[in-house]
């Protein structure tokens, strides 16, 4: 298999795990009380921690495939940004109009929370003015109804940054890249320093948020890591001997850290996300072994290769669509009395399959114009 085919395997893992990740929301943000609320929260944390590599894997795939950038900058921007912009805009509007649509259909307001448990009570007003207010915010940020769109803002930013970063990546040695990754690795600890030691570090203060290692921080490290690991493999023995223990340690920190913060009498959103933070050492420790192990998969079946190739085409559309189905899929799993510990993966299979079928249908019906809807 060529490297692109191997990265298709990584993409399948990333795509499915991001759907799984959003299927944990009805567990981690379970509305109301339940006799088994402790078990519900446990499984939400257990799966939520396990699935944190989903977004880093996407960014690493981007770095592996696009660094260094070979196209002229304006062509690259036109090709990459326009591909995501129109579907992002269309689906953002659809998600934000959903509460209003439910009101027009005479559906109960609580249904909105079944679909989007993260959204809170404001959306249950089923008001056009509320929906239009959310739509007006699209140029600036996502809303409570389309939380998953945060990644598209990030992705557009990465696309804008890639040709600039690429000029350095193309010229420097592997040793220089490793030095950059070392600097990035130090920044991964900053969220914990801010929480447990001081809100400011290395020149950061109330009038300066750009501290000493600011320019090494963020998702650009995952871009470079994906680029670097594209051509630097570990042996299977090294993955088993080093990678799997590394994953286990990263998972333990993520899981027990999340359980610690959610057990506090009161916690902020920043504290809630602290151990789930994508740019953290524990999540990096989980992500690297998955990326390297997935690259080892050698798919020989032509049918599976075609399926993976189709996922590459449909993947962006699946990401756009899937958030509509994660909540209802969990409700279906509960209605079918699937054991609690299996509800998240079962719901994920349903949400993933339905989303994929919808994207295939849109592409078949709309032909070439489907790119404006599902990428």
Predicted regions and their residues:
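Alpha-helical transmembrane segments and their immediate juxtamembrane cytosolic regions
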Residues: 3-375
